[in-house]
Every structure is written in C-alpha cells, then in structure tokens.
C-alpha cells in the first residue's frame, strides 16, 4: 500500500518501523530539521529514513502548492502522521483514497493540541494514552480508529511517561495497521462536548508559583523534568531549577515561598510544603537539595520568588504574526535590542528567528494563522501592539495561486483586524507599494495619489486590491470605531534573509534573491520584458528603523497615518540591479567557487509569470509623511545593500560541491 509519512521524534521513528513491519510501501517521509535550541534526546526520523533507503524531505512549508503537487505525483493510497509538528492542509489529506491517519499522545477528545504529555502531568492526571484517528481539517478532531490507555504512576515524570506512551503506540500500531491496510476498521466519532484543547508550552511557562498547593508545584516539576527545561524559581535575582521534588503535608504558618528548613530543603506553599530533592543553581551542576540551599545562600526564613526581585517596568508587548519572515525577523532583532519590549511571534517556520529562540523576551509558537485563531485572539487581547505581517507577497504567486493570495492576505488578516477592534488594540498594518498600481504620478503620495489597477482578467492585481481594501477597512474602523492604527507601505526593501535560495528555485522569491540564485547556479539572469522597470530599493535596516519609530509612536504622531517607507534616491531598473549585482559578485572573495556568468536573457512576462500578469514601469515614493511623523530619512546606499545581501546568500551555499 503506497504510503506517504509525516513524522518526527521517537513516535515518528516507531511509526515508520511499524508501517514497514506491516508491509506498507513508504514512498516518501516528511520531517523537520532539528531546532538547535531544543535538547534532542529522541530518535532521528531523517537518519532512519536514510538508513532504510526512503526519500526524506524537511520543507519549511509542506503545504506550499509545489509540495502539494509533488506529493500528488507520489499517488499515495494512505497518509500517516506521527508527531509531525505542522498541520497538514486539506489538499494533501484528500490525496489519499484510503484517508490520512494521525497518532496523538492522549486519549482524545481530551488534550487535543500541543504537548499533551506535559499537560497531563501538569494537571495531575492519573491516566492518559495514545489515539490513532482519522485526520480532518481541524486538528485532532477526526474519528477515532483505535486507542490504548496508559496509567500514570505517582512517580512518573515526563521522560518515563514518554517511554510508556511509545510502548503503547507500538502495540496500538501493531494491532491496527493491518486492519487499515485491508479496509477493515471501525471508526468512532469524537464527542465534542468532552473535548479539551491545550497549546504549546515554553520554558517560561514552568515558573513555580509558591502560593499554589505543593501538589500542583510537584506536578509542574514532574512535567518538565530533564530532558525538558525544568521548573524554576528565584532567590533575589538568582534563578535556580528544580529537577525533582516531594510533597510534604507540612502544617506551617510560614508565608508561601519561605524556606522552612535547609536539610531537607523544604519550601512553604499555599497548601503544604515542597521538598526540593535535587536542583541546579543557574547554569551550574545538579545537586541535592541541602547543597543547593548552601550554594544559593538560603537559611531558614529566606524567601523565594517566582520572578527576579528587580523586575523592570512592564515591557510593551508586541505581537508579530509572520515573525519568521523578512520584515518580522529583522524587526524582532531591533525590538529585542531595547530593554522595554516583549515580542510574541507566530509563524509556520523558525529558520530565520532561531537566533532569538532562547531570548527571555521572545516567545514563539510555530503554527498557521488560519488554524491558530484562538491563540491569535488571546494574544491580540494580551498584547499592546499588533503587526500582522503574514502575506503571500511574491508576484509569481499572484497569477499562480490568486485565490490562496486572497484567502491569506485578505480574509485571514481581516479577522485579525476585527480582533484589534474588539479588544481596542493598536494595529500597525503592512500595506504595500503595490496599492499604487499603475499610478502615473512622479512620486506616489499616501494622501493624494490615485490607486490604479488593471482589469479583472489580470489576476496579478489580486494582491494589490486585497491590501488596498484592507487599508480602507482599517481606515473606516479608525474613523467609525476609534481603532488606533498606522498603515506603512514598504518600497522594495531588500537585505539579508530576503526569501531564500530554495524559494528562488521554485520561482517564489523577490527579484534580488532570484538574481543571486542565477549567479550561484551559473544560469542566465532572466530580464522580464527587458528589465526596464524601475524600482526604488530600500535597505532593510533603513526600513526597520522607520518601522521601529512607528512602534515607538513619539507624541502619537503616527496614529491614523499612512506612511511610505522607501528610498527615492535608490531608483534603478531591474536590469541595472542585475548589472550592479554581477559587478559585486565578480569581486567577491568566494567568486571562484561558482560557475561562469551565463549572461542576461530577455523573456516575456507571460512566459515567466503566466498570462494574467501586468507590470509597473516605475514606483517612486514620496516620503513626506515619514519625515513629518518619524523624523526619518533613508541613509544606506543601494550598492552597500547589494553587497551585503549578496555576501549573506553566498555564505549560505554549501561550497563542498562547487568547482574551485
């Protein structure tokens, strides 16, 4: 039975082994690259696939239309998901005639969502299990095919329960996979009235709140014990981790968080007391409780606290949806450079923000905005400033996938805008220079230029029109319901991390990244319709500084404003951009690793983008509003931007196979 598998972690490995043992023919396996900030104690699906001679892939977005098409070409009869961390789109699920099945680590419908292993321990459950269920569009909601119950012992911690669940999963799959193969299964619909759902946990969620009962704190310790990050507390500003604990029914009038004794190390709680059996001060070594007390300088009567003693004033909470994108990751870097921002981010990947994942003021959830609506609504309510940066913004997609562009760029963002209205939150919305369309003004002005687009049978305008309509909706909400907003319009921002070379390989990237790929691979640089179209290229650092000032909003000068962010002095045609890039490439110290330049080739836009494409001959911003509202002007010359962007991408290329 031809099978496509989505898998990660130990459960992914055992699921693959079970399929092979049951005689399934695995055509391809999709997995994830390991997160360098995560302690990898589990088996490698990629290594197992390689050892078994099975093609394995780890795309950033498996739901991209090109991956959907590649999976369709495999003609899977059935699909399995074993602890794959991304939701799989309905288009993929519908490819398999026998259906798609997911292995989930709880007794569904209880504990849908993320980290059920940890949540059942946090909540003090005495039973959990594994469930194999049919996959539907909504996460973990499909009919149940099989379940096995697993008892949770009082001394179970996360790793021991993980091993129990793996053992149960092997049994479950051994019993169930033959029945699926022969179409002989009985499915039971989940009872929605019994469903519970839990979100992703982060290390910051595991602080010990001493006013809670000792049993609750002990469960927290069990849930995140090694190899998870551990429960923690503070002595003054000194952080320490509790690796194991015991509950004492100690009757004491001491304030919660007070040290009752140091040998054993006993801490008063809201109800009872918690003995810290083993722990660790800062980044030190693990030690027994009494030695930990000595290391931390604790004596009877000392007080512990859940937060550092000298906590600064509350940071401004900024929600960035699409935080892993070009603007999102650079903006995150700028905000975290200051000491008064807390950044909350959501995206379907994390490669560009991996450098922030361990930052104490950066909180990331991997997910899709079309699915994580409850998480988004909660964080809109929780945060002070919202930046919905998620969009399909590459021209080839406007003609290739116009409906997907509309659904994501318009419909999903409209929902977020309405959350901002509902909870009265400030929104900073990314409009686009594309809204000006075929405007003939010498300088495109936010307040006076007409927004001119082509006919309906030219789908390339669906992005421009979607953004324009959202601009108008936001403006109306500001006028009629008091929404605090700023619209910003980027003009051809470029710099390191603008798309990636893999995106360029499938045509889904902006101009400079595509040109760099041509140089790297020794293929001709394609000049669409001769490359005479002119753009004003803006360095990402200039753009981000302007965006940062919008967030700062000195004197509330940005409220209700539309602000172009571009560099009118950096105007060049695409052909000129290609020539400047080539000159920089020829001088680069890594030049000898790459093939000879293959020349320029003029191609028609219809052959490259499709028949529904129209181009814009020029696009130059007026930056009058940026001067007035932000006291900002761009400073970085285009050549410097080209040099740094090229250098970044060349240093990401694996040079082992390149000629020298």
UniProtKB/Swiss-Prot annotation:
GO biological process: lipid A biosynthetic process; lipopolysaccharide biosynthetic process; response to antibiotic
Residues bound to NAD(+): 347, 368-369
GO cellular component: membrane
CDD domains per record: Arna_FMT_C, Arna_like_SDR_e, FMT_core_ArnA_N
Active site: 104 (proton donor), 434 (proton acceptor), 619 (proton donor)
Catalytic activity: UDP-alpha-D-glucuronate + NAD(+) = UDP-beta-L-threo-pentopyranos-4-ulose + CO2 + NADH; UDP-4-amino-4-deoxy-beta-L-arabinose + (6R)-10-formyltetrahydrofolate = UDP-4-deoxy-4-formamido-beta-L-arabinose + (6S)-5,6,7,8-tetrahydrofolate + H(+)
Keyword Cell inner membrane: no
Binding site for (6R)-10-formyltetrahydrofolate: 86-88, 114, 136-140
GO molecular function per UniProt: carboxy-lyase activity; UDP-4-amino-4-deoxy-L-arabinose formyltransferase activity; UDP-glucuronate dehydrogenase activity
Keywords, in A-Z order: Antibiotic resistance, Lipid A biosynthesis, Lipid biosynthesis, Lipid metabolism, Lipopolysaccharide biosynthesis, Multifunctional enzyme, NAD, Oxidoreductase, Transferase
Family note: In the N-terminal section; belongs to the Fmt family. UDP-L-Ara4N formyltransferase subfamily.
Protein name: Bifunctional polymyxin resistance protein ArnA
Gene name, Swiss-Prot/TrEMBL: arnA
């Amino acid at each position: 039975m031809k099978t496509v598998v989505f898998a990660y972690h130990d459960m992914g490995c055992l699921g693959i082994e079970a399929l092979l043992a049951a005689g399934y023919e695995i055509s391809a396996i999709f997995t994830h690259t390991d997160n360098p900030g995560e302690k990898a104690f589990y088996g490698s699906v990629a290594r197992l696939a390689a050892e078994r001679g099975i093609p394995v892939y780890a795309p950033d977005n498996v739901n991209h239309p090109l991956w959907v098409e590649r999976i369709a070409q495999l003609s899977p009869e059935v699909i399995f998901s074993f602890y794959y961390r991304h939701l799989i789109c309905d288009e993929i699920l519908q490819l398999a005639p026998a259906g798609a099945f997911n292995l989930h680590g709880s007794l569904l419908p209880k504990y849908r969502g993320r980290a059920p292993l940890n949540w059942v321990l946090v909540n003090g459950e005495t039973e959990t299990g594994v469930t194999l269920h049919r996959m539907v569009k909504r996460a973990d909601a499909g009919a149940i095919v099989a379940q096995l119950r697993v008892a949770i012992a009082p001394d179970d911690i996360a790793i021991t329960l993980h091993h129990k669940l793996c053992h149960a999963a092997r049994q479950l799959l051994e019993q169930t996979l033959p029945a699926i193969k022969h179409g002989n299964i009985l499915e039971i619909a989940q009872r929605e009235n019994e469903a519970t759902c839990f979100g992703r946990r982060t290390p910051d969620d595991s602080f010990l709140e001493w006013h809670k009962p000792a049993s609750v704190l002990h469960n927290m310790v069990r849930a995140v014990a090694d190899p998870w990050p551990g429960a923690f507390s503070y002595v003054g500003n000194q952080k320490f981790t509790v690796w194991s604990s015991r509950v004492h029914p100690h009757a004491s009038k001491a304030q919660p968080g007070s040290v009752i004794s140091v040998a054993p190390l006993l801490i008063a709680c809201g109800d009872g007391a918690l003995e810290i059996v083993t722990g660790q001060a800062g980044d030190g070594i693990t030690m027994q409780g009494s030695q930990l007390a000595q290391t931390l300088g604790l004596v009877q009567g000392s007080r512990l606290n859940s937060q550092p003693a000298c906590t600064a004033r509350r940071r401004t909470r900024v929600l960035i949806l699409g935080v892993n994108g070009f603007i999102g990751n650079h903006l995150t870097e700028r905000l975290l450079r200051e000491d008064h921002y807390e950044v909350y981010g959501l995206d379907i990947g994390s490669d560009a923000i991996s450098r922030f994942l361990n930052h104490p003021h950066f909180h990331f959830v991997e997910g899709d905005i079309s699915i994580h609506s409850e998480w988004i609504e909660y964080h809109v309510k929780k945060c002070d400033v919202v930046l919905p940066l998620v969009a399909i913004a590459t021209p080839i997609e406007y003609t290739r996938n116009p409906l997907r562009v509309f659904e994501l760029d318009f419909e999903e963002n409209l929902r977020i805008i309405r959350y901002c209205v509902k909870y009265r939150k400030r929104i900073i919305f990314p409009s686009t220079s594309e809204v000006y369309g075929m405007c003939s003004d010498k300088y495109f002005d936010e307040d006076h230029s007409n927004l001119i687009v082509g006919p309906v049978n030219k789908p390339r305008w669906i992005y421009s029109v979607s953004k324009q309509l959202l601009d108008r909706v936001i403006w109306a909400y500001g006028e009629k319901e008091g929404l605090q907003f700023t619209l910003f319009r980027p003009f051809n921002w470029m710099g390191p991390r603008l798309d990636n070379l893999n995106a360029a390989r499938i045509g889904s990237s902006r101009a400079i990244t595509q040109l760099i790929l041509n140089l790297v691979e020794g293929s001709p640089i394609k000049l669409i319709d001769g490359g005479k179209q002119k753009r004003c290229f803006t360095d990402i650092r200039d753009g981000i500084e302007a965006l940062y000032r919008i967030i700062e909003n000195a004197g509330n000068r940005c409220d209700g404003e539309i602000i172009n962010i571009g560099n009118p002095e950096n105007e060049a045609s695409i052909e000129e951009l290609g020539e400047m890039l080539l000159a920089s490439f020829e001088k680069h110290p890594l030049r000898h690793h790459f093939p000879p330049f293959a020349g320029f080739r003029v191609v028609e836009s219809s052959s490259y983008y499709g028949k529904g494409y129209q181009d814009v001959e020029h696009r130059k911003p007026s930056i009058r509003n940026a001067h007035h509202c932000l006291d900002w002007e761009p400073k970085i010359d285009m050549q410097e931007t080209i040099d740094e962007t090229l250098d970044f991408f060349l240093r990401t290329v694996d040079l082992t196979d390149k000629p020298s």
